[in-house]
Every structure is written in structure tokens, then in C-alpha cells.
């Protein structure tokens, strides 16, 4: 066994990933029937619909005072995001830090940056583009417009969000 970091949005814990904005909206739009019929592809279908909608303006304020604005934010407590995709190059689920990618622009930029990240081994602080990569212990997200949230692939309400480090969780791992 080992202990991994556990973070929470408004007191709701998550282990691996979270998202606010387009990612959260994609999960919100994904129905149980879609998941049964299309499996993981259901999220792609819902994501295409979410990207046709107006994206909220999000403001992430970290515990060390950084303020970042964007249209969508994904959080990773480990390198992987949504299965085998390695999107957070610097993430480590035992370091006490939550990694975040703040997308500055809406849909086309998010898609382009995500595809480039997959090719380049994930997002990291040394690569520049239409996003900012930050590492934090706690923070908050405010929104102008509807900003759905997801935690580990489940819809978890809407912003505003208070992000906290909820402690450690013992897991069985190889």
C-alpha cells in the first residue's frame, strides 16, 4: 500500500482528475444511456456539443496569490487524465500539489493544445501556448457564466469552487 494525495472541490473529494468549464460541461451532458451505448466515446459526443456552447470566463486564484483567467480548467493529481492519456507531465500524486491547466481561449484552442500535449508527453510549465500550467496546494475558481464541474468523471455541480487538500488516502498499488 501507499498513500496518495486527496483533493476536494467544495468538500467533495476526488482522487485523479477534475475539470471546470468545457470538461465539466461534457460530463454534465453525458447521460447514463450514452455511456451504456457508446462507452468512453460518449464523452467525445457530449464534448462536441459542449464546445458549441459559449464558454464561461473562469478565474483561478491559487493559495500563493497567482490569479489566472481562462475559459476552461483541468486539474490532475497524477499524470493521467481520463484513462491512458498522459496530460500532466509534472504531476505526482504523492507530492502534496495539484496540477492545473488553464486554457486561455475557447474550443478550437483547447482542442489544439490538448492534441499537442498528447504528442509532447503532456502539458508542462516549460511549454507555452494558449494555456498556463500551474501547481498549487489550494485555491478557488470563480466564474462568469455557467461553469459545470466534474470530479473523476462524474458531474459535481457548478462553480464557484473552493479547492482544498483533503489529506491522504491509502491505496493498494503495484
Identify the residue ranges that each predicted region occupies.
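Hydrophobic residues embedded in beta-strands of well-ordered beta-sheets
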Residues: 13, 98, 169-170
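Catalytic core of DAGKc-family lipid kinases
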Residues: 1-71
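Glycine-rich phosphate/pyrophosphate-binding beta-alpha loops
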Residues: 19, 23, 74-88, 155
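Short acidic/glycine-rich loop or secondary-structure boundary segments that cap or lie
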Residues: 23-26, 68-69, 81-84, 108-111
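A short catalytic or substrate-binding loop motif that flags glycine-/basic-rich loops and adjacent residues
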Residues: 50-54, 94, 133
